[in-house]
Amino acid sequence: MAEPVSPLKHFVLAKKAITAIFDQLLEFVTEGSHFVEATYKNPELDRIATEDDLVEMQGYKDKLSIIGEVLSRRHMKVAFFGRTSSGKSSVINAMLWDKVLPSGIGHITNCFLSVEGTDGDKAYLMTEGSDEKKSVKTVNQLAHALHMDKDLKAGCLVRVFWPKAKCALLRDDLVLVDSPGTDVTTELDSWIDKFCLDADVFVLVANSESTLMNTEKHFFHKVNERLSKPNIFILNNRWDASASEPEYMEDVRRQHMERCLHFLVEELKVVNALEAQNRIFFVSAKEVLSARKQKAQGMPESGVALAEGFHARLQEFQNFEQIFEECISQSAVKTKFEQHTIRAKQILATVKNIMDSVNLAAEDKRHYSVEEREDQIDRLDFIRNQMNLLTLDVKKKIKEVTEEVANKVSCAMTDEICRLSVLVDEFCSEFHPNPDVLKIYKSELNKHIEDGMGRNLADRCTDEVNALVLQTQQEIIENLKPLLPAGIQDKLHTLIPCKKFDLSYNLNYHKLCSDFQEDIVFRFSLGWSSLVHRFLGPRNAQRVLLGLSEPIFQLPRSLASTPTAPTTPATPDNASQEELMITLVTGLASVTSRTSMGIIIVGGVIWKTIGWKLLSVSLTMYGALYLYERLSWTTHAKERAFKQQFVNYATEKLRMIVSSTSANCSHQVKQQIATTFARLCQQVDITQKQLEEEIARLPKEIDQLEKIQNNSKLLRNKAVQLENELENFTKQFLPSSNEES
C-alpha cells in the first residue's frame, strides 16, 4: 500500500477498511442468525440450538446494524475553544485556506459552528432542529444569516457545509468546530456533553498578548474530568504583535511556554514534558490566512505588508498543521474505531462459541441417532422373530385350551343328561290330556329343562373355563408385553381389559324336542299290542302293528287234516330267529284280523284242552287285572308316562348334540383368546409400524445433522477469517492498541 500524502488519509483508509469489515461481519452474523433460527425452530432437532443462542445472534445483528450506521457517519472532529476575540475563527479560516467563517473586527461567534465538506458545489448551512438547507454564497451572507437569527443561542449548533472542491482539508472527513468564547457563559458542562465528548482534538486558541486566563483553564479542567487524557493543542495567536518589541520577544515566548507546559503537564497531566513541546505553538492566523489567499490567487505569499518574522510564524503554523493532522488521524482512528474493533472481536468470539456448541450438540445428536437407528433395526428384527415364535406357541396353547374346554363341557353335559329324569321330576305344572293343555305343558317343560341344564352346566363349567381363559390371556399378555413400548405396557390393562368370560351353551332345547309325540292312550299290559311291544321292541312292534297283513309264508289250507305232502315254509337261509318270530306273529295276526272265527276256533281249542272251569278262572283274573289297570290309568299316571317318554326322547336327542355343544363352547373360548391375541398383535403391529417410520426418519435426521455440522464449521471458519481481518486492521491502523494487547 502506497504511503498516503496527507496524514488525514490514514483515517479515511481506516474508516473504509473498518466499514468493509463490519459490512462483512453484519452479513456473516445475519447468515449465522438465520442458521441458528432455522436450527432452533426445527421440531426434529431438539436442543441443538438454544433460545439464548438465537436471542444473542439476533441481538448482535441489530447491534451491528447500528454500528454500521454509526461508522458511516464517523469523522474526525477538532474543537476550537478560547476567549472571545482570541482568533478561533481566523485559525479555522487559515487552516481552510479561505475565509469560510466570519472573523475580524465586528464579528463575534455567538454560537457553535461546525464546518464540514459537502460533495456539492454550493455551500449551505443547517440550524439545529431544522432540516432546511439554507444557501450561503459568501461569508458576509453567512455572517448576516447568523446575526439575523435571533433564536441562535450560545449552546446551539449551526452546521456549515462547504464544497470539498474549494478546500482540500475538508475532503478527508474532517469537521472543525468553532465555539463562542469560554468567558461568555457558565454552561460549560452542557457544552462539553453536547460538543466535546466525540471530539478527537481540542485546540485552545489563546491571545499571546496576555497570559492564559482561569476561564480557559477551568473549561479544559472540566474537559479533562470527562475525557481520559484529551489531545490538547495550544495556539498562542497574534504572535505577530511581538515583532514590534523584538527585544522582549524571547522572554515573552519563554514565559508563555512555561505557563503552557505547566498547564498541560502539571495541571491537566495529559502529556509529558517532551510531548508538550510539540503541543504549543506561536502563530498569527491572520497573517497565514492573508498569505494563503494570496497564494491561492497566484500571487506571492509575501505580497501583502507583513510583520518581521512572518516566515518563522508561517513555518510554525505549518508544523502545527502537520502534527495536528498526524495526531487527529491517529486519535480519531483509536477513539472512533478501537472500541468497535474490540466489540467485533468479542462478537466473533461469542459466535464461534455458539457455532462450536451447535456443532458439538449436532455431533452428539448424530451419534445418538446412528446408534438409535441400529437399536431400532435390531428391535424390529427381534419383534418380528418373537412374533413368529409366539404365534406358534399361542396357536398351540389355544388348541390345548379348547380341547380341555370341550372335554369339560362334554363330561358335564353327559352327567346332566344322566340326571335329566331328576330335572324332569322337579317340573310341576297343570297336566291334562287335552291337546291345547299338553302344548303349553310341553313348552313350559322345555323351558324348564333348558334353563335348568344351562344353569347346571354354568355352575359346573363356567368358573373353571373362565379361570382357564383368564390364565391363558394373562400368559399371552405377559409373553407379548416385552415387545411393546413402556408407555403401552402401562396402558395394557385399559387397551386390552381381561373381563370375565361368559360361556354360552345355546342348547336350543325347544327346537331340539319340538317333534316329540307323546303316547298316553291306555294300553292293557296283557293286551295284544303291549305283548308285541314287550317281546319285539318298539320298532319291530310298529312294523307288525302297522298292517303287515300279507304273511311272508303260506299256512296249511286245512288245519283238521294232515296233508299228504306237507310243505315247509320257505324262509331265507340267512333269516334270524327274531325275523322268524316276527313272521309267525304277523301271520297269526293276519289270520285273527281277517275274521272273528279265529277267536271262536282258538277259544274252542283252549276249552277242549283245559276245560271250562280253568278257562273261566283265567278270564275272571284277566278281566280283574284289566279293570284294575283301567281304573289306575289316571291323569297323574298319564303325566308320569308322559315324563318318562319325554326323558327317553330328550336323552336320545341331547346325546346327539353333546359333541356339537362342546365344540361350540370350545369355539367361543377360542374366539375369546384369539381376540385378545389379535388385539395384542394389533398393538405390536402399531409398534412395528412406528419402528419402521422411525427407522425411515432417522437417516433424514442424520443428514440434517451432518448439514448442520458442516454449516456450523463453515460459519466458524468465516468467523476466523473475519478475526484475521480485524487483526490485520489492528496491526495496520491501531499499532499502539495491538502492542498493549
UniProtKB/Swiss-Prot annotation:
Main subcellular localization, coarse class? mitochondrion
Which reaction(s) are listed as its catalytic activity? GTP + H2O = GDP + phosphate + H(+)
Coiled-coil stretches are 371-408, 679-734
Domain remark text: A helix bundle is formed by helices from the N-terminal and the C-terminal part of the protein. The GTPase domain cannot be expressed by itself, without the helix bundle. Rearrangement of the helix bundle and/or of the coiled coil domains may bring membranes from adjacent mitochondria into close contact, and thereby play a role in mitochondrial fusion.
Q: What is its EC number?
A: 3.6.5.-
The first-level EC class reads: hydrolase
The entry's other comment says: A truncated MFN1 construct containing the GTPase domain and the associated helix bundle is a monomer in the absence of bound GTP and a homodimer in the GTP-bound form; GDP cannot replace GTP and induce dimerization.
Q: Name one GO cellular component term.
A: outer mitochondrial membrane protein complex
Q: What is the effect of changing residue 88 to T?
A: Induces a strong decrease in mitochondrial clustering
User: In UniProt terms, what function does this protein have?
Assistant: Mitochondrial outer membrane GTPase that mediates mitochondrial clustering and fusion. Membrane clustering requires GTPase activity. It may involve a major rearrangement of the coiled coil domains. Mitochondria are highly dynamic organelles, and their morphology is determined by the equilibrium between mitochondrial fusion and fission events. Overexpression induces the formation of mitochondrial networks (in vitro). Has low GTPase activity.
Domain of life where this protein originates: Eukaryota
List the Gene Ontology MF annotations in alphabetical order. Answer: GTP binding; GTPase activity; identical protein binding
| Consequence of substituting residue 173 to A | Decreases GTPase activity
Segments on the Mitochondrial intermembrane side according to the record's topology features: 606-608
> What effect on the protein does mutating residue 74 to P have, as reported in its record?
Mildly decreases GTPase activity and impairs mitochondrial fusion
Q: How is it modified after translation?
A: Ubiquitinated by non-degradative ubiquitin by PRKN. Deubiquitination by USP30 inhibits mitochondrial fusion. Ubiquitinated by MARCHF5. When mitochondria are depolarized and dysfunctional, it is ubiquitinated by a SCF (SKP1-CUL1-F-box protein) E3 ubiquitin-protein ligase complex that contains FBXO7 and PRKN.
**In which tissues does this protein get expressed?**
Detected in kidney and heart (at protein level). Ubiquitous. Expressed at slightly higher level in kidney and heart. Isoform 2 may be overexpressed in some tumors, such as lung cancers.
Taxonomic source organism = Homo sapiens
| Stretch list, region G4 motif | 237-240
Task: Please describe, based on the UniProt annotation, the reported consequence of changing residue 99 to A.
Answer: Mildly decreases GTPase activity
Name the chain's protein. Answer: Mitofusin-1
The annotated consequence of residue 336 to N reads:
Loss of function in mitochondrial fusion. Abolishes dimerization. Decreases GTPase activity
Q: Could you tell me which residues belong to the region G2 motif?
A: 108-109
